[in-house]
């Protein structure tokens, strides 16, 4: 499994940046040295989610222009000393960076980190191509609605055209609502797996804790009182190759839904 990972999605608003931040924090909590790269030039948010917006001195554009090296532009996280961010510029455009620029930046950083995680812009334009250029593995974030699944499927097709095998692409289902699934009002994990024909690596239930965390600049992964932080730890452990069952992502689900979810997962395994 590659250690350069891009987190992408077919559309905006599915929680991609939040997942990037929390995955980075979860890996760092497990002792990994992690660099997060915000590749969403002009629309950067990763620094805000991490609570680092006031600590930025240099951005990726400064690196591309030769003003500083990639390492000189990094911002160290306040709470996790083995987590770093390479920020995006708010005033630049995606056309100011090329796929080769991204490859060069990652090539210089990778010897110093266990994992590099790139937050890709949503969609399939230039910024997306920049973000996936140096990646060895892809996490596609979607929510359990048909429009989001359709957009994710389109991105997966592009990734396959870029040479990514199915083994290098995994799906994260975000904002999953088990009570709606139980009533037949939301797609199941089984539905999504069969539609996208890819393995699901994590399910993140809908949680108010994530909204609160985004507004405070402290990722929910760092909140020991939030049960949803365990979901991101599960994801981080799977990224490291640990065999954490997908069922473990539902430890926060009410007891009344357990039988329903077990049925979904038994179908998923048979599929």
Swiss-Prot record:
Keywords: ATP-binding, Cell cycle, Cell division, Cell membrane, Membrane, Nucleotide-binding, Septation. ATPase required for the correct placement of the division site. Cell division inhibitors MinC and MinD act in concert to form an inhibitor capable of blocking formation of the polar Z ring septums. Rapidly oscillates between the poles of the cell to destabilize FtsZ filaments that have formed before they mature into polar Z rings. ATP binds at residues 11-18. It is a peripheral membrane protein. Belongs to the ParA family. MinD subfamily. Its main location: membrane. It comes from Thermotoga maritima (strain ATCC 43589 / DSM 3109 / JCM 10099 / NBRC 100826 / MSB8). One of its GO terms (cellular component) is cytoplasmic side of plasma membrane. Coiled coil: none annotated. Interacts with MinC and FtsZ. NCBIfam families: minD_bact. GO terms for biological process: division septum assembly. SUPFAM superfamilies: P-loop containing nucleoside triphosphate hydrolases (SSF52540). The keyword DNA damage does not apply. The gene is minD. This is Septum site-determining protein MinD. GO terms for molecular function: ATP binding; ATP hydrolysis activity.
């Amino acid at each position: 499994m590659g250690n350069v990972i891009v987190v992408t999605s077919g559309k905006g608003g599915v929680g991609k940046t939040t997942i990037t931040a929390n995955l980075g924090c979860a890996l760092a909590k497990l002792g990994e040295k992690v660099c997060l790269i915000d590749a969403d030039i002009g629309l950067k948010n990763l620094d805000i989610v991490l609570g680092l917006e006031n600590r930025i001195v240099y951005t990726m554009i400064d690196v591309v222009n030769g003003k500083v090296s990639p390492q000189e532009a990094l911002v160290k996280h306040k709470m996790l000393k083995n987590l770093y961010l390479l920020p995006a510029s708010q005033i630049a455009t995606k056309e100011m960076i090329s796929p080769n620029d991204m490859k060069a930046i990652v090539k210089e950083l990778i010897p110093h980190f266990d994992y590099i995680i790139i937050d890709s812009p949503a969609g399939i334009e230039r910024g997306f191509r920049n973000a996936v250029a140096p990646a060895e593995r892809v996490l596609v974030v979607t929510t359990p609605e048909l429009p989001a699944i359709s957009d994710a499927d389109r991105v997966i097709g592009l990734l396959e055209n870029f040479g990514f095998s199915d083994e290098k692409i995994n799906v994260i289902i975000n904002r999953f609502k088990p009570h709606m699934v139980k009533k037949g009002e939301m797609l199941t994990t089984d539905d999504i797996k069969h539609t996208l024909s890819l393995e699901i690596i994590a399910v993140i239930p809908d949680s108010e804790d994530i909204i609160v965390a985004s507004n405070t600049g402290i990722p929910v992964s760092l909140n020991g009182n939030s049960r949803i932080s365990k979901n991101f730890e599960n994801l981080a452990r799977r990224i490291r190759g640990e065999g954490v069952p997908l069922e473990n992502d539902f430890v926060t689900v009410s007891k009344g839904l357990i039988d329903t979810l077990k049925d979904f997962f038994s179908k998923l395994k048979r599929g």
